[in-house]
Amino acid sequence: DVYCKGPDYKDHSDDITGKIDDEEEAVKSVDGEIRYTEDITFSSSSLLNKFGDVYNDSQKSFIQKMLNSQDFDKIKSKVDNLQNLKVLVVGETIIDQYVFCEALGKSGKEPVLVLRDLNMEQYAGGAAAIARHLSDFCGTVSLLSMLGEKKEHEDFVIESLPANIEPYFIYKDEAPTITKKRYVDYISKSKSLGVYSINDSQMNGENQNQLHAYLDDLIPKHDLVIVSDYGHGFLSKKTAQNISKQSIFTTLNAQINAANIGFHTMNNYNNIDCAIINEAELRHELRDRESNVDLLMKELTKSMHIKNLVVTRGNNGAILF
């Protein structure tokens, strides 16, 4: 039997994934042989990048400059070196549910849109999603997070985590596991409604003591701490100060969302090595709608003693200060 591949795989060293060697070994194990076609090749990725409307003109220009000025092997080497990192992720685990619906129309008795549910998808989001993403290129990842008192969805969360993630959970008294359910039109994929199951009051003293004991034990065992503070009652001001005083590289993301806007702030933290927020969150933090972003970044880094601040700006990219 013959296993065919395109000519771009003829030189195995050009395959950055290294999977072509595994494929050849599998073919030979069943007495097959691998052959390569000879023809003009068209890379689907290249065609999409050239002719697809994924990026605007300024983004295309930036990508082209990056391609011309950066060495891919050097970037890949930097990413590969992350394999040696031991990373601790701290933050709320959020169960993201998406109910895909068909719109039936207006109710006959009330001015209400009526939907018929078709199917539901469920994901382990929040800090669990961050940990799962990191596990792809970091060898050891620990997740310190919060679930509800009755441990709802715990099995689902654990099953969704790769083998190189070690989870540690605080079970918040008198609270459910945070669940955010969105109703989505199955054709347009636009969201019609969101329903949150959440108790976002601060954890009681016993729960906080458990969290601080975990932090004191786990932080010295890691090279990096990533804090994802969703403002749902897991990380109090005292906890933020506890994390800030640790002598370890600490990265912070403190998000604004529908449940915490007006009450959530980054200023509980101090001496952060790297903070990542979007422009709206930066302006919200400083109560400033109009000033230049660069000036606001300078003000925030000075007031919170942030060494590196990244502000994302949607299709305008990101700024590092």
Predicted regions located by residue number:
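Conserved phosphate/ATP/ADP-binding segment of small-molecule kinases
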Residues: K76, K237-F321
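Conserved N-terminal subdomain of the carbohydrate kinase-like
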Residues: I95-I226, Q246
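Glycine/threonine-rich flexible loop motifs
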Residues: Y9-D21, C101, H232-K238, E285-R287
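Structural motif
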Residues: L88-V90, G194-Y196, D223-I226, T251, ...
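Short glycine-rich anion-binding loops that position phosphate/pyrophosphate groups of nucleotides
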Residues: D8-D11, T93-I94, I198, Y230-G233, ...
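Hydrophobic anchor at the start of a short beta-strand
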Residues: V87, V141, P167-Y168, T250, ...
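Nucleotidyltransferase catalytic core that binds NTPs
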Residues: D1-N68
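Positively charged, low-complexity intrinsically disordered leader regions
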Residues: M66-L104
